[in-house]
């Protein structure tokens, strides 16, 4: 039963996912009631580090964010992914530079990523790429699985296979 996609029942209660309720019963009987409860510091940090490590199409960089939040994150964490995860979890924004979409000067176009977009990307991955979703939830994910979440968050679909 390991290879089966998850059974997903969903209910949207608000327009910005503040009360997004998702009940997911997977092959290992894991039950998720609120998708936001998945997004812990460790989960977001692992997702970002796996998606962007060795990635030649996109990279993370910090956007202008609340200076106090950035200072608190830098005091608490050393790793860039941990700092960026902290920023996202505290209503901040990070930029993702897309090397395949350059502006007129040849510089990569930066796209904003916040927690709501990341949750939206995760939800789209759950419905459109159940194998990747199952891998992420079981801790067996790789760059391609996590990059799907980022692409769904930024574009609403998979752009780079």
Stretches found by the model and what they are:
Residues 30, 34-43, 109, 113-117, ...:
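Alpha-helix boundary/N-cap detector
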Residues 135-160:
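Acidic, proline/glycine-rich low-complexity IDRs
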Residues 26-99:
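Long, contiguous N-terminal structural blocks used for assembly/anchoring
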């Amino acid at each position: 039963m390991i290879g089966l996609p998850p059974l997903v029942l969903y209910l949207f209660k608000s327009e910005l996912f503040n009360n997004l309720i998702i009940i997911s019963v997977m092959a290992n009987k894991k039950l998720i009631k609120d998708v936001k409860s998945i997004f812990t510091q460790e989960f977001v940090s692992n997702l970002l580090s796996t998606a962007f490590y060795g990635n030649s199409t996109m990279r993370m960089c910090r956007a202008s964010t609340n200076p106090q939040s950035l200072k608190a994150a830098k005091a608490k964490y050393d790793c860039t992914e941990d700092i960026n995860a902290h920023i996202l979890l505290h209503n901040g924004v990070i930029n993702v530079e897309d090397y395949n979409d350059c502006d007129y000067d040849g510089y990569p176009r930066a796209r904003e990523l916040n927690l709501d977009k990341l949750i939206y990307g995760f939800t789209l991955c759950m419905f459109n790429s159940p194998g990747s979703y199952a891998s992420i939830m079981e801790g067996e994910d790789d760059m391609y699985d996590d990059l799907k979440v980022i692409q769904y968050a930024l574009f609403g679909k998979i752009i780079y296979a």
